[in-house]
Amino acid sequence: VRYNVIRWVSSAYPSYGAIGPSFANPRTGQILGSDITIEWYSGSSTPTMDELFSFKNEGASEAINAHFHNDGTACTLANELKSQFLMGTTFAEVNSEDPKTISRAHKEFLYYLVLHEMGHTLGLNHNMKSSQMLSPTDLHNTAITEKIGLIGSVMDYPAINLATDKTKQGNFYTTKPGPYDLWAIEFGYKEFDEKTEEAELQKILSRSTDPNLAFGNDADDMRSPGKAIDPRVMVNDLSSDAIGNAEERFKIVNSIMPKLKGKYSKNGESYAELRSRFNMLNGQRRNMAAVVSRYVGGVFIDRSFVGQNSTVKPFTPVSKVQQKRAIEVLNKY
């Protein structure tokens, strides 16, 4: 209770990634304390996970095992983020990028990981819709991203922000709480006079139709086939044009693949790192294909309340143009 800290650990279960558990007063729900733990593997640029480490261990804590059981409270961001980060560093390394740029990417990666877990310590839900906040043209505009962030909430599982033209590279990850985070924290933590509290809370809630405050948690995300219907509530995506962003990342992966063997094959050493990088990039292809495929047959959901005068219908099928575009991207890559 006295100290709330961030622990950097090297444990027997590196696959758990990172956690930000908290404990609360059972009578009031008030959060009394919390700690963030980051496993060295998740926070490092090391690409290889030793096969000796299983993804479930009877000796591991309940919190760690929750990560591998589709538990509603589980958070697998560290592993998702690590794969995205390795894609970015591999892209930089095969193109002989300035080490300072790679260092900046690593720093932003760690910032984001800690911010996400800190959000959990404050009681925030995952928000897998917030990565839709910015348009593709704004993603690398640091005048915007350093003011309000790359995404609406640090509680998302976003794709790394990579520019195909390195001279235009902006932030790789958001490094500050987004508009949704600030809004949710204001609702949950701001103190009001007892007489005005209800009216003030309703005033905060009335802003829910602001596009920058878009929300969709684990119950609505489409990471698993056959689950949910709104393709905007998805992991490993980025920007208001998730299809276009995925296509850009397909191009990046395809540009990396021919250079892998020359970069990561070393005389007298095993193929472990080459294999790991190759598998990681194929995993990214799978993620991008998943993002694009969700637009085929998808339905956009709007949960505005009666009286909010929303101009958006509760259910809007993804347009024929978008669905056709998604299929074309899948066929091409």
Language-model segments: residues:
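Alpha-helix termini
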Residues: 42, 46, 129-132, 136
